[in-house]
Amino acid sequence: MRCPSCSSLDTQVKDSRPTEDSSVIRRRRVCLACNFRFTTFERVQLRELTVIKRNGRRVPFDRDKLVRSLQISLRKRPVDPERLEEMVSAVVRELESGGESEISSEAIGEIVMEHLRKLDDVAYVRFASVYRNFREAKDFEAVLGELSSDELARAALLRK
């Protein structure tokens, strides 16, 4: 592993431990050339995913880009970073276990919205507004109507 401070390849792992859900290994490292300490994270990657954008361009799947877009949707919302990380891991697992190495950005968006809907309604609407490219207030009304009908259905099930 290359040192982020001096670019030396002479580094050593000082401590390794799994995260709470055991999906990632956290490693503390030290550079033997400059004594700089840094942390790396290691996770299993089942397959290389390629995203097919709306314009037809193909780009490698970027987990960090997904995290950033969700952080924007969740800005100022009462959601713990751990819950966000769990959701992102679940989305990535679903994508990787889907059997396809290429997946459309639309399919990724739908999967993300499915998970986000369970996490936070406001973030769901924010994400939907960008993903579905809302142009008018009625676009928001439609999504809010979906959420309202889901809430009514859940309440009816609880009464039974």
UniProtKB/Swiss-Prot annotation:
It comes from the Bacteria. The keyword Magnesium does not apply. A zinc finger (unnamed) spans 3-34. PROSITE patterns: ATP_CONE (PS51161). Residues 49-139 form the ATP-cone domain. Keywords: ATP-binding, DNA-binding, Metal-binding, Nucleotide-binding, Repressor, Transcription, Transcription regulation, Zinc, Zinc-finger. Residues 1-20 are annotated as: Disordered. GO terms for molecular function: ATP binding; DNA binding; zinc ion binding. GO terms for biological process: negative regulation of DNA-templated transcription. Residues 1-11 have a biased composition (Polar residues). Its cofactor is Zn(2+). Binds 1 zinc ion. PANTHER family: TRANSCRIPTIONAL REPRESSOR NRDR. Belongs to the NrdR family. Negatively regulates transcription of bacterial ribonucleotide reductase nrd genes and operons by binding to NrdR-boxes. This is Transcriptional repressor NrdR. It comes from Rhodopseudomonas palustris (strain BisA53). The lineage of its organism: Bacteria, Pseudomonadati, Pseudomonadota, Alphaproteobacteria, Hyphomicrobiales.
